Amino acid sequence: MKDRILNRGGSDHTIMKISDKKVLVTGAGGFIGSHLCEELVKSEARVRAMVRYNSSESHGLLEGLPRELYNRLEIVSGDIRDIDSVTKAVSGCDIVFHLAALIGIPYSYHAPKSYVDTNVVGTLNVMQACRQESVERVIHTSTSEVYGTAMYIPIDEHHPLQGQSPYSASKIAADKIAESYYLSFNLPVVTIRPFNCYGPRQSSRAFIPAMVSQLLSESVIKCGYLAPQRDYTFVKDTVAGFIAAALVPGIEGMTINVGTGKKISMGDLLQRIMSRMDLMKQILPEESRLRPPKSEVMALICDNTRARAFLGWEPGYTLDQGLDEVVSFVKSNSNRYKTDHFVV
């Protein structure tokens, strides 16, 4: 992948340009995907949102968008494992944001093949369809989990990759499929590698909303291992990185980390959440919420030099500002959250 570093303009300029584009978002019903669709519609892009077909005809987290924005989406159902539905969804689009994936790390220990089918074969289908339809730019979504336990921090894009779970291994393979389509076929791919992302609408599978939900309703807080360190980025900042990556010229073939560069342990984060909520409760780590020892990733801290230099990107939300938004959302939507649903 390319290693050149250039100075680029800021995000305000690039967001205005998205209004010229017809875009596809795969995984649109997910957490980041729904926020990306929301921002794209606000920015006057013509948005086709691909959600996984289901018998209830649910559109996932897109249904939480304000109605006036939701109604401006072109929603299509399909499955990225099916090349025909992917090709149909890609047809006529200028830019493709590929976010669809199986993301739960714990389930990958039990059903690794399903992660290969969706994350690897699905990504292959998206790249092939984009090549066939001659799209202008493909934004492929990676994850900081591909780095495994850090050999050094902060982690830059040159850090070795290590598959410490079947999930992360499948994402490494997907990243390499995307890279191969750039190198072999000159497909204009940019890979965005987000570090831990959080914000409103995130499910209780994730640490922050799970802890907020428990604090609101339980006397004892059940959690997993609290020593690992993470770099948490508010979802609106992550989305700004995606949009900039779609529009900044000359960055095809690059992988770009998106994260704040600030570290916090899970234990300190839980204390920070309790402080913001003014609620102090007993903490009880549970073995069932722990990863296998060799699979645990102890530190994921972002070096965002490349995002700042190439995309003109920088985080706009402090951790406290973002936590306050999550707390407000969970309080207003407590019926959506199960306090026993948190997974590692």
Provide a role label for each language-model segment:
Residues 235, 255, 290-314, 325:
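Conserved C-terminal active-site "lid" loop/helix of NAD(P)H-dependent oxidoreductases
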Residues 173, 177, 181, 211, ...:
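Hydrophobic alpha-helix immediately C-terminal to the catalytic Tyr-X-X-X-Lys motif of short-chain
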Residues 81, 110, 118, 165, ...:
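Residue-level signal for the nucleotide or nucleotide-sugar donor/cofactor binding architecture
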Residues 67-73, 185-188, 212-222, 248, ...:
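A short C-terminal helix-loop "cap" of Rossmann-like NAD(P)-dependent dehydrogenase/epimerase domains
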Residues 172, 197-210, 219, 235-236, ...:
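Glycine/proline-rich active-site loop of Rossmann-fold NAD(P)-dependent oxidoreductases
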Residues 225, 253-256, 267-270, 278-299, ...:
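C-terminal "lid/loop" region of Rossmann-like NAD(P)-dependent oxidoreductases
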Residues 238, 242, 258, 269, ...:
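Non-catalytic, hydrophobic alpha-helical segments
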Residues 3-197, 325, 329-333, 342-344:
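N-terminal Rossmann-like NAD(P)+-binding domain of SDR-like oxidoreductases, especially those catalyzing
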